[in-house]
Amino acid sequence: MSLGRGKYDFYIGLGLAMTSSIFIGGSFILKKKGLLRLARKGSMRAGQGGHAYLKEWLWWAGLLSMGAGEVANFAAYAFAPATLVTPLGALSVLVSAILSSYFLNERLNLHGKIGCLLSILGSTVMVIHAPKEEEIETLNEMSHKLGDPGFVVFATFVVIVALIFIFVVGPRHGQTNILVYITICSVIGAFSVSCVKGLGIAIKELLAGKPVLQHPLAWILLFSLVVCVSTQINYLNRALDIFNTSIVTPIYYVFFTTSVLTCSAILFKEWQDMPVDDVIGTLSGFFTIIVGIFLLHAFKDVSFSLASLPVSFRKDEKAMNGNLSSMYEVLNNNEDDLPCGIEHTGENISRRNGNLPSF
């Protein structure tokens, strides 16, 4: 592949990945609006087993939006490296959070706004440093990569881990440990992304007039994708049903993306020719997104704004009028009026907080 063509495909994949995030993030808002309209009409809610949402056009608009987003995401893997496309999936969470604050009147606190900003910055860093060229262009090359000893060892290890978690660890600890079902989804997800990548290459070859349907690998990838996605959906739904969504979402994003990046590094060798600064930049962007997603979800139910900051961090209007500027000064002035015993108690409290008094 020529350098110019590689960059052209890279930007097509980037555009498709970002478009996918917008459609998927917006789909949650449309479906939620439709469900809220049904609730106001007194219809039986979906959580109670009702299916009135099938008659609500907003819900269908959300479903079509999600379908369009998934198609765009599928196509993005055919043009851009998985190292770029998979982490950018976090932007759908960002889009959903921003739109919900405007259209669903769901308040986005200070932690959420900082998380959104960090996610944008992390995504930008990843786009700048991600590999620009594709290593695989045909199914024959894909077949050769799948037979690489390094990937065979990795795939065998992943299958063994998945089977152990499904049949041994899951039945015993799946109801109490959040990492069990998420681990199953994540390690299987590494295979599903590889299958999508291979099928994307097959579609490109098919459009070019090549006899792809006669290639057995195309059908193997399709069958593997169906099995992997079915398994992912099954165990992800179990995790969401048992544990809090605000905890499942960021942990799943971290585990899933890490699995995909590891698989891509071994199978497609996208990191092999990357300079050290690009590797560091890509990892830095990824960890920045992780922090942003964590802030966005972990503190979403906490009422916190700029007005909640400590008094010493904000401008005190009383200080301008010659009055005391902080609670510290109030406590400091009252210290002389405290009995000796209370002073020692204060020292003990200070010591428990890690601040030893001077002697």
Swiss-Prot record:
Classification via Gene3D superfamilies: 1.10.3730.20
Spans within the Cytoplasmic topological domain: 31-56, 100-107, 171-175, 237-246, 300-359
Topology relative to the membrane: Multi-pass membrane protein
Entry annotated with the keyword Transmembrane helix: yes
Expression triggers: Up-regulated by low magnesium ion levels.
GO biological process, alphabetically ordered: magnesium ion transport
Superkingdom classification of source: Eukaryota
Keywords: Cell membrane, Endosome, Ion transport, Magnesium, Membrane, Transmembrane, Transmembrane helix, Transport
UniProt topological domain (Extracellular) ranges: 1-9, 78, 129-149, 197-215, 268-278
Compartment annotation: Cell membrane; Early endosome
Transmembrane segments: 10-30, 57-77, 79-99, 108-128, 150-170, 176-196, 216-236, 247-267, 279-299
The keyword Nucleus is assigned to this record: no
Tissue specificity of this protein: Widely expressed. Expressed at high levels in the kidney.
Family as reported in the entry's similarity comment: Belongs to the NIPA family.
Protein name: Magnesium transporter NIPA2
Organism: Mus musculus (Mouse)
Encoding gene, per UniProt annotation: Nipa2
